[in-house]
Amino acid sequence: VAMASLTVAAQAQNISLRVSVSEGRSGVNFAPIHAEVGDFALTPSLPGHAPGQQWRVVARDAAGTVLHEVAVKNTQQRHIEVFNPKTGAIDMSRQVKQADGVFEVSLPFNADIASVDVLAPASTNVGIKAVTAPLAKFDRASLEKKVGASKMMRTQSMAAAAPAATVTTVVNTGPSNARMDYVFIGDGYTAAEMGKWQADAKKVIDGFMADPLFAANRANMNVRRVDIASNQSGVDEIDKGIYRDTAMDGEFYCYNIERLLCVNETKVYNIVGSVLSPDQRDVIVVISNSTRYGGSGGAIATASMNTSSVEVALHEIGHTAFALADEYEGGTCGISSEPTEGNVSINRTRSVKWGSKIAAATPVPTTVGSVANGTVGVFQGGRYCSNGIYRPTENSRMRTLGYPWHAVNEGLVKTVFGKYTAVTQTGTLSSGGIAYAPNTSPGYIQAGNGTFNVQLTGPAGADFDLSLYKSLSTGWSKVAVSRGNTSSESINYVGTAGYYYIEVKSYSGSGSYTVKYSVPPK
């Protein structure tokens, strides 16, 4: 098991980066276009079942050792899907490559962080030096310069006569660093139409929160509405020769697809980022001022005010926020290896990845119509393949709009929400003392597969160490450690299901500490 040895500054500090992506003659170019530092949450790594190739963003020390690593979406890959407005079934599915894109990521930025690299999908484990050249490298000096420039731009914007955007909190269940925060922003609404936008936003948000999946996880969510006026009302409809001057350049018929609604993602991030911190914008949904049917997924979800807009957006958020696979046929099919998504598989037996949810009386493989819809089984067809790929239920929202999510998808969503539900424990250590988390009975945590995030903040001048232990057949074993010359440490560990506990140890010095941790749900 790889173990990380981290040295970090006394004061916990993270950096949020907005990185532009563009295609150049010599390959893909990455450039930081915005940066800010603060005590906000780290970006959760994409689930192991996330579809498509991913970029890895790593923070290194001066020796080149990886201190932190996170998987982010490859924004150059875009899967396009168009649903039938009458039946909810898929009409068209296609993969396209975007020349330009943008993504945001939050990483530790302690004193020992010397650089941030972007790597190809095959990457190094935490604590081991990379053996492949990075796609991009940003040294600390350039990042600190970008932080200063971004702060100056934001200060100048706040000093303007009237802010371009305003924000309203609709649902507030707790601190943003321990919640999945949803942002709904309107495009193509003029200043005179702000009342209409606010009414439209209420319809969409109420529709989201009425969905059983979101209603069940309401306690783990915050929802905000961002208002910004466009110069003109409506949306570009390129196929009809209609063009509008809007805040985020919303347009139908992008990629020559009638029902595809796209926006300028850089403008979206800039506008939302001007009024919300990194913790407050986990999932962004742009609502265009049009009743034309359409929408899209990707890093940012889009929808119109068509009566079916909520259904389209819910499916797309299944991709954007929860990394769920499509469960329909049609498109580019591949069955050479096990899909990484948690709701599709090439395994047609009871040992399939969701096998624990299959009742003994349910036949496997499972024939369509043989059991009630929603019954978990092994149904042929999914992830664009009519044969060789299997899905857990006959019909779910990831196959046809208007259907429930069902148990397997609900469980995968619960895992993602669990990454935002951090536990905070405080205490006091004397020199040489040891404390454990959790400090309540039974003294350990039962966790599932996924990423474990632990952050320790202690008193200045002290040296505290942080360790993560797992129960193995041979006893408790230390699987990750953060050990430096200060009292602030962090662990980002990808582990398997089992029992865990955290140890905080004073190497020297005494005082109060805070340990914050989140683990994948069992």
Where are these regions (language model features)?
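Beta-sandwich interaction modules
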Residues: 87-112, 122-127, 131-134, 485-495
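Short amphipathic, basic-aromatic surface patches that mediate peripheral association
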Residues: 14-49, 451-458
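Acidic, Ser/Thr/Pro-rich low-complexity intrinsically disordered segments
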Residues: 433-487, 493-498, 506-508, 521
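Short pre-active-site segment immediately N-terminal to the catalytic Zn-binding motif
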Residues: 196-197, 294-314
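Propeptide-to-catalytic entry region of secreted or membrane-anchored zinc metalloproteases
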Residues: 54-78, 144, 152-273
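Edge beta-strands of jelly-roll/beta-sandwich modules across compartments, strongly enriched
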Residues: 408, 505-522
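Active-site recognition of the HExxH zinc-binding catalytic motif
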Residues: 311-327
